[in-house]
Amino acid sequence: MSAYTAPSQIAQRQLDYFNGKHVLVAGEVEDLFPLELAEHCESVSVFTSNYSYFRQIRAHSTITSYFGSQLEADSQADLLLLYWPKAKAEAEYLLAMLLAKLGSGCEIVVVGENRSGVKSIEKMFQAYGPVNKYDSARRCSFYWGQCNTQPNAFNQADWFRHYSINIHGQQLEIQSLPGVFSHGEFDLGSQLLLETLPSLSGKVLDFGCGAGVIGAFMAKRNPAIELEMCDINAYALASSEATLAANGLQGRVFASDIYSDTADDYRFIISNPPFHSGLDTNYKAAETLLGQAPQYLNKQGELIIVANSFLKYPPIIEQAFSNCATLNKTNKFSIYHASK
């Protein structure tokens, strides 16, 4: 069985497209195919918004790796290899941002699973130049194209979606970039969590902060707390920072692969835990979050999360804390609480 994802396998079949090129890899890349690519190219750089993948790929000196919500560095790339992301809006964002950086004349290769909507590249790329499908395998497609027009200048501020929420009399302005969970809307799970939260004090972590809804609400309702917000996704971090700024709130926003970069003395860990990874469901991060939570809480520390009721989280929480209470429940979501 190949160590590569299906999109990487179809790219591997077409290595001639990359020979002698300066390649910039971006999008939903999840494996070490860029290392093999580097053996055939003049240079390979990887831009990722996924902090977990960045921590993995940055250890390899044969390629240059960047993490962020936009590529700040100058690039000499003449070919963009785009792994099609799960959200169409994120694909549009990546094309606009990266082609503005690479300019007219650059080539593009797009790979992705057919179920991810990769076919959308045919219409999406029309503004830049021609693109055509050249291979199909493993339920994936391989497209090649060329940017023949000078792309518009990119301004990240143009890509934020803005919306307002009002919970318990707290009015908040939310800023959300493409690629963020529940982009541009207030999800019902987070709403139930905010309606249920008790008064908070001390150092509080919003784990998996997304667009910053939960963290901003906690800071506005409990102005004395020391707020920290983390996420694996760079678009989420940029969105949370923008949400805090839009509401005149303060908090430390940082990247963390589960607990890789967090403190270990929180009074509260509050979360709407992520359980989707790409197009698939992945419970590992949430199970680690819950199972290891006591190690990152102070002696009086408490964990409060919202989760889909069908997820088997209570036994994990019970095993970690020796207690687990349900604070609130609807037919779809449950609020779980545990304390040390």
Swiss-Prot record:
| EC number of the protein | 2.1.1.172
GO cellular component terms, alphabetically, are: cytoplasm
Q: Indicate where this protein resides in the cell.
A: Cytoplasm
Record's keyword terms, sorted: Cytoplasm, Methyltransferase, rRNA processing, S-adenosyl-L-methionine, Transferase
- Tell me the GO molecular function terms: 16S rRNA (guanine(1207)-N(2))-methyltransferase activity; nucleic acid binding
InterPro entries according to UniProt: DNA_methylase_N6_adenine_CS, Mtase_sm_N, rRNA_ssu_MeTfrase_C, RsmC/RlmG, SAM-dependent_MTases_sf, Small_mtfrase_dom
**Principal location listed in the UniProt entry:** cytoplasm
In its keyword annotation, does this UniProt entry include S-adenosyl-L-methionine?
yes
Q: Does the keyword rRNA processing apply?
A: yes
Recorded catalytic activity of this chain's protein: guanosine(1207) in 16S rRNA + S-adenosyl-L-methionine = N(2)-methylguanosine(1207) in 16S rRNA + S-adenosyl-L-homocysteine + H(+)
Instruction: Note the superkingdom of the native organism.
Output: Bacteria
Q: Which NCBIfam families match?
A: PRK09489.1
Similarity section: Belongs to the methyltransferase superfamily. RsmC family.
**What job does this protein perform?**
Specifically methylates the guanine in position 1207 of 16S rRNA in the 30S particle.
Checking PANTHER family in the record gives: RIBOSOMAL RNA SMALL SUBUNIT METHYLTRANSFERASE C
Describe, as the record does, how this protein assembles with itself and its partners: Monomer.
Name of the featured protein? Ribosomal RNA small subunit methyltransferase C
Species this chain originates from: Vibrio vulnificus (strain CMCP6)
Q: What is the lineage of its organism?
A: Bacteria, Pseudomonadati, Pseudomonadota, Gammaproteobacteria, Vibrionales
Originating gene: rsmC
